[in-house]
Amino acid sequence: AEAMAEAMADAMADAMADAMADAMAEAAADPPPGFIGVRG
């Protein structure tokens, strides 16, 4: 059970990191009005 919970936590963290990276890439490619980011 512990191993399962750990694997689940890992998978969740991976999915979250992926989603975050996707959202960041999207924001960088198409910044909303007033967005201050890497592109300034």
From Swiss-Prot:
Could you tell me where this protein is found in the cell?
Secreted
Alphabetically sorted, this entry's keywords are: Amidation, Secreted, Signal
**In which tissues does this protein get expressed?**
Expressed by the venom gland.
* Entry-annotated residues carrying Arginine amide: R39
The Gene Ontology CC terms held by the record are: extracellular region
Tell me the function of this protein: Venom protein with unknown function. Does not induce paralysis when a high dose is administered by intrathoracic injection into the blowfly Lucilia caesar.
Please indicate which superkingdom the organism of origin belongs to.
Eukaryota
Give start-end of the signal peptide.
Answer: 1-3
Q: Which organism is it from?
A: Tetramorium bicarinatum
User: Which residues are annotated as pro-peptide in the record?
Assistant: 4-29
In Swiss-Prot or TrEMBL terms, this protein is called: U2-myrmicitoxin-Tb1a
Could you say which protein family the record assigns here?
A: Belongs to the formicidae venom precursor-01 superfamily.
Q: Which residues form a coiled coil?
A: none
**Where does the UniProt entry say this protein principally localizes?**
secreted
Misc. remarks from the entry: Is very weakly abundant (1.81%).
